């Protein structure tokens, strides 16, 4: 009997059974749960071991990253109130593309009051979605500014460095001048992680004002900074970056993440010379994953 035909009650039993690995083929059964199935799962949830719950949600998140059809929103919503911090953080990540602005008050409360730094960091990240929606005027203006104010307060406040960095990245969508000042301050720091966060925010801003800074950072000694600058160059469609990015392809970048980012950013910037280089690179590719990325980049031109 296939997982699709298995009664959901048996799926729940399999999840609760610590003596056997939960079958990966059953993960998709948690997508778009029917109300009755969700109620049954939530009734059993407190009796399922914490490790099994964490593993399930982590596996669902991994599936979500590669499968654009599945949605675990219905499961994740009630788990935002789970007593386990890892479960709460994973629930936020599962809701990473859910545009329901009714979630915002919960996220703001978690950002400010949750005892777990991981949860606060996840909340800071997911609020970036609503910064983007706010700039597009797709959520109420008052709610958008409430998110903006909260994130600015976090960046300026005394929370952990990681949470402040995630908040700055989410603020990248904001057009408020105060945010631009925060980005400039972060970029002026010695810490390369702060600089990378600033560049990430610049890429999200869509503002030409950051082009010179991004171009300068393409040659940075730190891979994390180069990676962020390369991505920002693509997001901002900086034509002047094209020769340097093409040279990176020619010379071969040792860092795989940086090399892949160069390919994608060039696909965003475009140009016939980019098509020629990527086509040649595809012909030489021996790695299937790299070849798939290049094909996707060519399609994006």
At which residue positions do the language-model features occur?
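Alpha-helix N-cap/helix-start positions at coil->helix boundaries
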Residues: 20, 35, 50-54, 85-86, ...
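Alpha-solenoid HEAT/ARM repeat scaffold
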Residues: 21-24, 54, 58, 89-90, ...
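Eukaryotic acidic, Ser/Thr-rich intrinsically disordered low-complexity regions
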Residues: 271, 279-301
């Amino acid at each position: 009997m296939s997982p699709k035909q298995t009664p959901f009650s048996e799926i729940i039993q399999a999840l609760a059974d610590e003596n056997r690995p939960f079958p990966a083929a059953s993960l998709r059964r948690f997508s778009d749960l029917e109300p009755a199935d969700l109620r049954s799962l939530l009734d059993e949830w407190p009796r399922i071991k914490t490790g099994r719950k964490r593993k399930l949600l982590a596996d669902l998140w991994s599936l979500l990253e590669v499968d654009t059809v599945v949605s675990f929103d219905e499961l994740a919503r009630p788990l935002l109130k789970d007593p386990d911090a890892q479960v709460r953080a994973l629930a936020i990540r599962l809701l990473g593309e859910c545009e329901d602005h009714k979630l915002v008050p919960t996220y703001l409360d978690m950002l400010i009051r949750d005892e777990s730094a991981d949860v606060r960091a996840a909340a800071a990240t997911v609020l970036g979605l609503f910064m983007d929606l706010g700039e597009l005027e797709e959520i109420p203006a008052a709610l958008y500014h409430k998110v903006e104010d909260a994130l600015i307060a976090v960046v300026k406040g005394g929370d952990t460095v990681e949470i402040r960095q995630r908040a700055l990245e989410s603020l990248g969508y904001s057009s408020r001048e105060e945010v631009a000042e925060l980005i400039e301050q972060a970029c002026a720091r010695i810490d390369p992680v702060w600089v990378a966060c600033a560049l990430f925010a610049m890429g999200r801003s869509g503002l030409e004002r950051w082009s010179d800074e991004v171009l300068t950072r393409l040659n940075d000694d730190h891979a994390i900074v180069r990676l962020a600058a390369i991505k920002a160059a693509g997001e901002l469609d900086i034509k002047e970056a094209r020769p340097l990015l093409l040279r990176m392809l020619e010379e071969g970048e040792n860092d795989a993440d940086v090399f892949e980012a160069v390919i994608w950013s060039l696909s965003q910037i475009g140009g016939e010379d980019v098509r020629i280089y990527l086509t040649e690179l595809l012909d030489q590719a021996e790695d299937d994953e790299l070849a798939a990325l290049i094909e996707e980049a060519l399609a994006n031109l």
